[in-house]
Amino acid sequence: MRTSQYLLSTLKETPADAEVISHQLMLRAGMIRKLASGLYTWLPTGVRVLKKVENIVREEMNNAGAIEVSMPVVQPADLWQESGRWEQYGPELLRFVDRGERPFVLGPTHEEVITDLIRGEINSYKQLPLNFFQIQTKFRDEVRPRFGVMRAREFLMKDAYSFHTTQESLQETYDAMYAAYSKIFERMDLNFRAVLADTGSIGGSASHEFQVLADSGEDDIVFSTESDYAANIEFAEALAPSAPRAVATEDLRIIDTPNAKTIAELVEQFNLPIEKTVKTLMVHAHEESGHKLVALLVRGDHELNEIKAEKLPQVAKPLTFATEEEIRAIIGAGPGSLGPVNLPLPVVVDRSVAVMSDFGAGANIDGKHYFGINWERDLPLPQVADLRNVVEGDISPDGKGTLQIKRGIEVGHIFQLGTKYSEAMKATVQGEDGRNQVMTMGCYGIGVSRVVAAAIEQNHDERGIIWPDAIAPFQVAILPMNMHKSFRVQALAEELYATLRSHGIDVILDDRKERPGVMFADMELIGVPHNIVIGDRNLDSEEVEYKNRRAGEKQMIKTSEIIDFLLSQIKR
């Protein structure tokens, strides 16, 4: 590719509305342009990267035995009603009607469509297992699209779906997909971890996320210091404290706290250790519980894990917090004065709260708190559950080492769905015994466009993007200085360009009439890994300058050796 025949579209200034570095650099490098909130046009440089990611994903899916299909983005609403997700999915599901008033959705995922397809095509256990994949546009009507293509409304995704008659068969395919995903991200030179995860709205019995480690990541990932345990913080179990509850040493007393409406204010004003305080959080109760609200208690220095809390049978799904008006209508006090003593509601306490003694909490009267609360003496111990997020230093759930926490960007997710969709949609095959059997399913997703942004978050410096070779828009840039004034510079540039192309190398020849500084800045910004600078002065000694974008090192290479040298440097 020649720059004179290419749309480079680089920007010197960082757009004001770009929050994270990947969004900033994708705009500045001329990879994307915003069309509307959460909607982006991919420009030539962006498309080249996107296609390389897509090709690696496709190759490894094929290697793992998956079969490519293509399903419509527009899906009939009745399939979503049949699966039960029409009501469950919420406003992220964009719904519309056609001219005949028939309801449809823009597909955020394709479990319903593939299940409908397979129940009409497969009728015998002898035809299974099968694994189908597609690389296709998805749409989710995000309430607040942000971070560029990291959380866009329209995005490119690889989704795969497998069908089985036994759990053992599903596990084999799940393991194969786990290995394929690992190979995909290894080929892209990404620093990633596969972690245990919650199944979320997709459902199922087991899942792993593939997280690219980056400070800008939205997810907290926990790791053991002494084992291979790794999980999303939403999933990680917080073990019960090993030490028994201490003996009570204080009397229960009620204290005036008119200016302490938060844990931080309570701790500061009364010199109370935060570990001796309890937060009482009110959420809406399940309608079958007989109550409007449920109280959830966590230690003052801990955070409620909403994913864990939502799984409690007495909690309404999805989990929603009560408003101050709702709380006052039942308790007669505001959110800053709540506690477990004399609380006329169901209470669930975290494991760490269950072993506390002599602790402080709201008195369910505005401006008052109880200090010196003790279980079994002042009130019975209520239901105990794991309700909190783990913190650094907690014992690892597998009992080996302690936990560390890092930030991650989710780029892939695999699920063992079981029979959630196949049972709801009556997707059966004839089993070995001649009886109809509900198929067992797995599903496996990779956010192809999100991978591009995640790679940038992990590979950049103050000058721009530093692409891994495998997904760079161009592997080599040829930068001839004043080629329009020097015949021999132009001749070598053209010869090198033709030879590299004949070797299957993605190369860009900068044949613009631009100053050297502009040429260097553009190639560094778009992240070309290998750069060759051809100048008259160096040609006097039959040399060219090679610069590696990642290492930043320059070295002189003989013109007769440059092709072999580049082929040895490029990771293919």
Swiss-Prot record:
GO terms for cellular component: cytosol. It catalyses: tRNA(Pro) + L-proline + ATP = L-prolyl-tRNA(Pro) + AMP + diphosphate. Pfam families: HGTP_anticodon (PF03129), tRNA-synt_2b (PF00587), tRNA_edit (PF04073). PROSITE patterns: AA_TRNA_LIGASE_II. GO terms for biological process: prolyl-tRNA aminoacylation. Its EC number is 6.1.1.15. It is an enzyme of class 6 (ligase). The keyword Phosphoprotein does not apply. The keyword Oxidoreductase does not apply. It is found in: Cytoplasm. InterPro entries: aa-tRNA-synt_IIb, aa-tRNA-synth_II, aa-tRNA-synth_II/BPL/LPL, Anticodon-bd, Anticodon-bd_dom_sf, Pro-tRNA-ligase_IIa, Pro-tRNA-synth_IIa_bac-type, Pro-tRNA-Synthase_IIa_type1. Keywords: Aminoacyl-tRNA synthetase, ATP-binding, Cytoplasm, Ligase, Nucleotide-binding, Protein biosynthesis. One of its GO terms (molecular function) is proline-tRNA ligase activity. Homodimer. PANTHER family: MITOCHONDRIAL RIBOSOME PROTEIN L39/PROLYL-TRNA LIGASE FAMILY MEMBER (PTHR42753), PROLINE--TRNA LIGASE (PTHR42753:SF2). Consists of three domains: the N-terminal catalytic domain, the editing domain and the C-terminal anticodon-binding domain. Belongs to the class-II aminoacyl-tRNA synthetase family. ProS type 1 subfamily. Catalyzes the attachment of proline to tRNA(Pro) in a two-step reaction: proline is first activated by ATP to form Pro-AMP and then transferred to the acceptor end of tRNA(Pro). As ProRS can inadvertently accommodate and process non-cognate amino acids such as alanine and cysteine, to avoid such errors it has two additional distinct editing activities against alanine. One activity is designated as 'pretransfer' editing and involves the tRNA(Pro)-independent hydrolysis of activated Ala-AMP. This is Proline--tRNA ligase. It comes from Yersinia enterocolitica serotype O:8 / biotype 1B (strain NCTC 13174 / 8081).
